[in-house]
Amino acid sequence: MRNAIPRECEVVITVPETEVEDVLAFVGECEQVWRDEFATIEEGLSFKAERVELPKYMVPEEIRDNLVDAIYACPNGVERFIPTIPDTVETSSNLAIVEIANGKAAVKVLTRSSRESMKDYRNTAIESCFSMAGMHVERSGSYSGWEPNVNSPILHAMKESYKAQFGELPEVKVIHAGLECGIIGAVVPGLDMISFGPTLQCPHTPEERCHIPSVSKFYDFLTATLENTPEK
């Protein structure tokens, strides 16, 4: 899943027999350094190193170095926040998957942005990293951004509908996520849209799931909104 933030990694490395114990000790030192760096953020962080059988094939040194350099140089994380909404991410990328198998290496990155020009800028920077490493780069699965409109008529109408139904105004947020509204808006420019739904738990992880008790509230809100929407 390119959408999931990486949380685990496994790699086989080869070293001279005389250096094995030093490498095992170094891994332990790295674990402690990372535990200190990510204290209170990643409580369960752990490293494990063990002897395994010598692999049948190894990545040639030049290709290995180019690949590692490209991964290090590849932009990852937040690129920019929305200028008018400083606490909300506008553009980012996720270096999600690195695979080496059957004589080939593949790196998968997901870029998202509410602004198309910034998404293209980030994609070009990523493409440059791997092109310079001699890798073939493809772009696929792109979807359009959706810029927030605080003056949206449907937003105003649904805020009032929510207040009438539940006795309080809803908490309206701009989120950094790929939404269907971006795809629809690219096909029907100028369409007034809003995105809402039941609560999602553990987003951007393999455990992402819907909070079932929130579905009934979402359904009631949706039907009430439709009932109060005037016909055109």
What kind of feature is each model-predicted range?
Residues 1-112:
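Midchain, well-structured core segments that form catalytic/ion-binding scaffolds
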Residues 4-10, 58, 147-160, 183-187:
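Short glycine/threonine-rich loop-to-helix capping motif typified by GTGT followed
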Residues 13, 45, 135, 168-170, ...:
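A structural micro-motif
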Residues 15, 19, 59, 83, ...:
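Catalytic cores of large soluble enzymes that bind and process phosphate-bearing ligands
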Residues 15-20, 63-72, 79-81, 120, ...:
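His/Asp/Glu-rich mid-to-C-terminal helical/loop segments that flank catalytic regions of hydrolases
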Residues 22, 26-37, 125-133, 153, ...:
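Generic non-transmembrane alpha-helical segments
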Residues 90-177:
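Substrate-recognition/cap regions that form aromatic- and gly/pro-loop-enriched pockets
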Residues 90-103, 166-225:
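Zn-dependent metallopeptidase/amidohydrolase metal-coordination segment
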